[in-house]
Regions:
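Generic recognition of cysteine residues
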Residues: 15, 67, 107-108, 114, ...
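Glycine-rich, compositionally biased intrinsically disordered regions
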Residues: 42-89
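Aromatic/basic-lined ligand-recognition segments
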Residues: 73-96, 108, 159, 165-200
Length: 250
């Protein structure tokens, strides 16, 4: 039997994502426990790479109940690794924001379970107040040639692995944007084209993530060992891009 099975994936059916009854909460907890077992296996190696989960162990796994932070729906559950908690605290100093959300306002590596399978990659930005989104747009808007060159080089290095950048809507968005995707493996002159696309499409009030999708029956995610091995591969492939697009306080 696969590590995540159809019962797990079906937790994210459209009829379930708004629910908060005891049976669906228990089904979500099963997924949470499996993700915590993955975290137990990979956390030290992630730390060795300078990547860390939320400082509060209660928030290693994303929220299991519909609330304001997930816009009232649970359509995926995952774990994230990013900047060291002390760095986030310093960057967030003086900001009026919830701590649980503060971590998510910074670019993170993500492994999540959804209805169609498993996703791995980078969660770049929440709709409002994302630190690294602001940094990237400031650098591009200022015409920083070195930043753009490094970004293009990093983008060119991730072609051929099935990565897709998705930008989705926030419920508070005031325009008619319905979401767009950039498929890296299908674009010529991918670096320059991505910069143009990102500059135009990625903006406040929109979610933004770079993910590789693994279908339910994908052999690479059939075991916990396979999932962990694949996640390390994804982190290695995307690390250069992550480093370029993250704002670090010097």
């Amino acid at each position: 039997m696969s590590y995540f099975n159809d019962n797990d994936f079906d937790v994210f059916k459209s009829c379930n994502i708004l629910r908060n009854e005891s049976d669906i909460r228990q089904a979500r907890k099963v997924i949470k426990d499996k993700l915590l077992d993955i975290n137990e296996d990979i956390n030290q190696k992630m730390n060795d790479m300078g990547l860390y989960h939320h400082k509060d162990t209660a928030h290693i796994v994303s929220l299991l109940t519909p609330c304001e932070f997930n816009h009232g729906k649970v359509n995926w559950i995952g774990i994230r690794y990013g900047k060291h908690p002390s760095e986030i605290d310093e960057l967030n100093f003086g900001a009026d924001k919830e701590d649980i959300y503060g971590f998510q306002k910074h670019c993170c590596f993500q492994l999540d379970v959804c209805y169609s399978g498993v996703e791995m990659g980078i969660f770049h930005a929440v709709p409002r107040g994302s630190v690294d989104r602001m940094y990237c747009h400031q650098m591009l808007d200022s015409g920083d040639a070195d930043f753009k060159s490094r970004l293009i080089k990093a983008v060119e290095g991730i072609v051929g692995y099935g990565f897709v950048w998705n930008v989705g809507v926030d419920g508070l968005s005031m325009d008619d944007f319905k979401g767009e995707s950039f498929v890296f493996d299908e674009v010529e002159d991918v670096g320059e084209e991505f910069v143009k696309w990102y500059s135009k499409v990625d903006c406040e009030y929109r979610y933004s993530s770079l993910l590789c999708h693994y279908g339910r029956k994908d052999e690479r995610i059939s075991s916990i060992e396979g999932i962990e091995d694949e996640f390390f591969k994804v982190v290695e492939r995307l690390r250069g891009l992550y480093d370029v697009m993250c704002w670090r306080k010097l």
